[in-house]
């Protein structure tokens, strides 16, 4: 059963094995983790714009082969719209992809795993964990 949705920065730390203890958490929870298709887009974008796109795309493919990639769906969009409206009311904007990942995780009742606490702590109604 899925419990965790990894944010993009957690994926990058895991891929780079920095800090080293994050790999252990990853390996212990692989069957309970997923990423959003939004995170996949960010990983592909980063690999494509890198100096070694073929190598980095292969690394991303290997990484995501161990995870379930959840499509961003209608419920995720509804939840994200609610989050965006609440943040606008409070005057505390958060990056659009972080809103989408939070909305996606919230729509599925999943915990967002991120070290980007500065952004995600401002988002109402989601659960977060920092594995770094």
UniProtKB/Swiss-Prot annotation:
Listed SUPFAM superfamilies: PIN domain-like
EC class name: hydrolase
Keyword set includes S-adenosyl-L-methionine: no
Keyword list, A-Z: Endonuclease, Hydrolase, Magnesium, Metal-binding, Nuclease, Toxin-antitoxin system
Residues binding Mg(2+): 7, 98
Signal peptide: none
MF terms in GO: magnesium ion binding; RNA endonuclease activity
Keyword Lipoprotein appears in the UniProt entry: no
EC number in record: 3.1.-.-
InterPro entries: PIN-like_dom_sf, PIN_dom, Type_II_TA_system_RNase, VapC_family
Occurrences of domain PINc (ranges): 5-131
PANTHER family reported in the protein's UniProt record: RIBONUCLEASE VAPC2
Subunit structure: Forms a complex with antitoxin VapB.
Family membership noted in the UniProt record: Belongs to the PINc/VapC protein family.
Function description: Toxic component of a type II toxin-antitoxin (TA) system. A site-specific tRNA-(fMet) endonuclease, it cleaves both charged and uncharged tRNA-(fMet) between positions 38 and 39 at the anticodon stem-loop boundary. Does not cleave tRNA(Met), tRNA(Arg2), tRNA(His), tRNA(Leu), tRNA(Phe) tRNA(Thr1), tRNA(Tyr) or tRNA(Val). Overexpression in E.coli inhibits translation, leads to loss of cell growth and degradation of tRNA(fMet), these effects are neutralized by expression of cognate antitoxin VapB. Ectopic overexpression in E.coli induces the YoeB toxin, but this is not the cause of VapC toxicity.
Identification of the protein by name: tRNA(fMet)-specific endonuclease VapC
């Amino acid at each position: 059963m899925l419990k965790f949705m990894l944010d993009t920065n957690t994926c990058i730390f895991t891929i780079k094995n920095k800090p080293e203890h994050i790999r252990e958490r990853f390996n212990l929870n692989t069957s309970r983790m997923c990423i959003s298709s939004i995170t996949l887009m960010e990983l592909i974008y980063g690999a494509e714009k890198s100096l070694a796109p073929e190598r980095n795309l292969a690394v991303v493919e290997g990484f995501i082969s161990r995870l379930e990639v959840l499509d961003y769906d209608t419920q995720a969009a509804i939840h994200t719209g609610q989050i965006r409206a609440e943040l606008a009311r409070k005057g505390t904007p958060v990056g659009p992809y972080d809103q989408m990942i939070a909305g996606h995780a919230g729509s599925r009742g999943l915990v967002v795993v991120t070290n980007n606490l500065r952004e995600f702590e401002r988002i109402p109604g989601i659960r977060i964990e920092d594995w770094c």
